[in-house]
UniProtKB/Swiss-Prot annotation:
Residue numbers binding O2: 248
GO terms classed as biological process: electron transport coupled proton transport; mitochondrial electron transport, cytochrome c to oxygen
Transmembrane segments: 17-37, 67-87, 104-124, 149-169, 187-207, 238-258, 270-290, 308-328, 341-361, 380-400, 417-437, 464-484
Reported cofactor(s): heme; Cu cation
Binding site residues for Fe(II)-heme a: 65, 381
Protein name: Cytochrome c oxidase subunit 1
Organism in which the protein naturally occurs: Cyanidium caldarium
Binding sites annotated in the UniProt record for Cu cation: 244, 293-294
Gene: COX1
Coiled-coil region list: none
Residues holding heme a3: 379
Assembly mode: Component of the cytochrome c oxidase (complex IV, CIV), a multisubunit enzyme composed of a catalytic core of 3 subunits and several supernumerary subunits. The complex exists as a monomer or a dimer and forms supercomplexes (SCs) in the inner mitochondrial membrane with ubiquinol-cytochrome c oxidoreductase (cytochrome b-c1 complex, complex III, CIII).
Cofactor note: Binds 2 heme A groups non-covalently per subunit. Binds a copper B center.
Amino acid sequence: MSRWIQRWFFSTNHKDIGTLYLIFGAFSGLLGASISLLMRIELSHPGNQVLIGNHQLYNVLVTAHGLLILFFMVIPTLMGGFGNWFVPLIIGAPDMAFPRLNNISFWLMPPSLILLLASAFVETGAGTGWTLYPPLSSVQAHSGGAVDLAIFSLHISGISSILGASNFIATIFNIRNPGQNLYRIPLFVWSVLVTAFIILLTFPVLAGAITILLTDRNFNTSFFDSSGGGDPVLFQHLFWFFGHPEVYILVLPAFGIISQVVSTFSRKPVFGYVGIIYALISIRILGSMVWAHHMFTIGMDVDTRAYFTAASLLIAVPTGIKVFSWIATMWKGSISLKTPMLFAIGFIILFTVGGLTGLVVANSGLDISLHDTYYVVAHFHYVLSIGALFGIFAGFYYWIGKICGKQYSETLGQIHFWITFIGVNLTFFPMHFLGLAGIPRRIPDYPDAYEGWNIVSTYGAKVSIIGTILFFYVVYLAFTNGLISEPNPWSLRRERLDSSSRTTEWLIASPPIYHTFNEIPVIKET
């Protein structure tokens, strides 16, 4: 067997598996972004543009876009890619706790992706949205195998995530550096740890919900079928008990990356380290107690709505602690506006905008009007499309030199930031106005009155795609004729222990040798 196949297909090395995850995430992200551009072109003007009036096909695109970005781009990139690459390096571990489990965690993802893509080509595809609500996902409304394939895809992806999460928990608790207690590990490791616990506790609930849906579709049960004594709202409760923590699974590792980046480029330790840790844990706990704010329109009684409104508004407190801690870290720091820092600042500004619209839709009275309008789309894309994505870009530009030993072009990186920043704002900010005007989501046509802001939004999507193409060009240039990266490219003074070197990965070579720590290094306070 060739050494290449041995290395990449049977790898047990956390760096190689991290690289595979990053490549997989980039591929899935391109697919998801292409689908979103197709949807925006369809919505650029009233009437039929590219989908010849096929509303089912439009909903298949919505479903594929959501699932691709959430399960196949963001989680594999942030947890699988950056998590695998840097958690062992930062905590001084020789590898992950279970290297072969790590391998199967990755190799479950491509079959899962294939099943999801296959579902779009079976009969009319799965036009349910990523939420898979019955009765739309029931056998009466989607009679073919498409929804079943999507369910199997989510099962396999969920198994992968659960295995990966248990691996991270075992690694961080058991093969951490002897000198690093839990209050000394960097915030990126903390964010991965908290995220792993969320995955471990919520993915099994999703698995249960979609398994029951599978039996409803194929084995004549009626858990979600009201004609047989079931309740479709039960699915919504089960799904959102997973689905709301899921959005924190997506954004918490990005929080960790932003904490590291802001600290490095402000030349200061992060402000309120312990406060940020407790904010992370609070978000994790509160995030599992607010799921029904996605369901204000199903006819809950007023006491239930009052509780879920109050609990949802309460999440703003730990989130605010994190945002103000990042701002305080930058306050009076010696700020260096390199590309990762630009993405971090962009993240803080735009995530705050998304958080503010979140405060609006958390109010049950208002949400009755705003539910399933473009206002909600604008809200969660500001948090996810801008939050998680900017976190990924910040992490990539921050660590690319460590991953491949080559540095990117700073000029092109900054141009990429500005194109992306302008593009995503042009895309999603007008959606607030459309939502307030009452345009519903998941519908490919609309009255003429809404055309103006839709044109602006589609223009923004095209700008964002140009930014994405530029990003891949930046990566191509870095790999082909990039500058050789030093062990710590962000150091002001050419010393090993500059103020920016607060984590272990900057003390080793770029790229690191295949087996970085043959024996666990000892870290001591000086």
